[in-house]
UniProtKB/Swiss-Prot annotation:
Lineage: Eukaryota, Fungi, Dikarya, Ascomycota, Saccharomycotina
DNA-binding region: 21-89
Domain of life where this protein originates: Eukaryota
Coiled coil: none
SUPFAM superfamilies attached to this UniProt entry: HMG-box
Subcellular location, record wording: Nucleus; Chromosome
Organism of origin: Eremothecium gossypii (strain ATCC 10895 / CBS 109.51 / FGSC 9923 / NRRL Y-1056)
PROSITE patterns (UniProt xref): HMG_BOX_2
UniProt region (Disordered), positions on chain: 1-23, 64-94
Covalent S-S links between cysteines: none
Compositionally biased tracts (Basic and acidic residues): 64-87
Protein name: Non-histone chromosomal protein 6
Length: 94
């Protein structure tokens, strides 16, 4: 007996508004962007996934004091995003 084939209707995603503000970056993303080239230089020929793994290990190894500058950047970026989003929503609604 053959299994009944079910067909799902695909829902189309909304197109992303190019004028929408970019999302706020996390503290880890600031750290990763700053250290990605260093990790690649220390490990030539490393794959994309391995770079992420090494960065994650380095992030976990940092103390709270060492993470503080990245946390501060993330907080400032979050405020930037919220203010840009507020302005964007106000102009979009008008």
């Amino acid at each position: 007996m053959a299994a009944a084939a079910t067909t799902k209707k695909r829902t189309q995603r909304k197109k992303k508004d190019p004028n929408a503000p970019k999302r706020a970056m996390s503290a880890y993303m600031f750290f990763a962007n700053e250290n990605r080239d260093i990790v690649r230089a220390e490990n030539p020929g490393i794959s994309f996934g391995q770079v992420g793994r090494v960065l994650g290990e380095k992030w976990k190894a940092l103390s709270d004091d060492e993470k503080q500058p990245y946390e501060a950047k993330a907080e400032a970026d979050k405020k930037r995003y919220e203010s840009e989003k507020e302005l964007y929503n106000a102009t979009k609604a008008a």
